[in-house]
From Swiss-Prot:
This is 3-dehydroquinate dehydratase. The lineage of its organism: Bacteria, Pseudomonadati, Pseudomonadota, Alphaproteobacteria, Hyphomicrobiales. Homododecamer. Gene3D superfamilies: Dehydroquinase, class II. It comes from Brucella melitensis biotype 1 (strain ATCC 23456 / CCUG 17765 / NCTC 10094 / 16M). Belongs to the type-II 3-dehydroquinase family. PANTHER family: CATABOLIC 3-DEHYDROQUINASE. Its EC number is 4.2.1.10. GO terms for biological process: amino acid biosynthetic process; aromatic amino acid family biosynthetic process; chorismate biosynthetic process; quinate catabolic process. Substrate binds at residues 75, 81, 88, 102-103, 112. Keywords: Amino-acid biosynthesis, Aromatic amino acid biosynthesis, Lyase. One of its GO terms (molecular function) is 3-dehydroquinate dehydratase activity. Catalyzes a trans-dehydration via an enolate intermediate. It is an enzyme of class 4 (lyase). The active site is at 24 (proton acceptor), 101 (proton donor).
């Protein structure tokens, strides 16, 4: 059975390739989406790739993923450090989530060291640039395979 992964991207990620390339790299969000689609095909996953600068959109999409029994690969961007709403959405949707960040948030400003989202995810990948998205998809594919082999759903953190 092919599993769907919602790849959700938070604020300012639409500016990738132009915004602080020394921190975030030169890949655009379109480049990352294309890479994710290629990787998903090899992993037998379907992806639904989305970006919004609005917290409520991300919350609604997480809820939608839960309703569709999909997985979530999320780069909440700055909302990692501020959004109790995204934390609560993940917890209430009981959806399997991997959090990804292009930069190593622990090697940056102190206010970026804490993520409200991390506590309700299966895992966090940070500091590997655009490759982090592919690592996240591989992790979710492994979880899907484990669920299929065990005949059960492994939800939440």
């Amino acid at each position: 059975m092919t599993k769907t992964v919602f790849v959700l991207n938070g604020p300012n990620l639409n500016l990738l390739g132009k915004r602080e390339p020394g921190i975030y790299g030169v890949a655009t969000l379109d480049d990352i989406e294309a890479s994710c689609k290629r990787e998903a095909g090899q992993l037998e996953l379907q992806i639904d790739f989305r970006q919004s600068n609005h917290e409520g959109d991300l919350v609604s999409w997480i809820q939608e993923a839960g309703e569709k029994n999909a997985y979530v690969l999320i780069n909440p961007a700055a909302y990692s450090h501020t959004s109790v709403a995204i934390h609560d959405a993940i917890r209430s949707a009981r959806v399997t989530v991997v959090e990804v960040h292009l930069s190593n948030i622990h090697a940056r400003e102190a206010f970026r060291h804490h993520s409200h989202v991390s506590a309700v995810t299966k895992g966090v990948i940070c500091g590997f640039g655009a490759e982090g998205y592919l690592l996240g998809l591989r992790a979710l594919a492994a979880i899907a395979k484990e669920e299929e082999n065990n005949g059960q759903s492994i939800k939440g953190a």
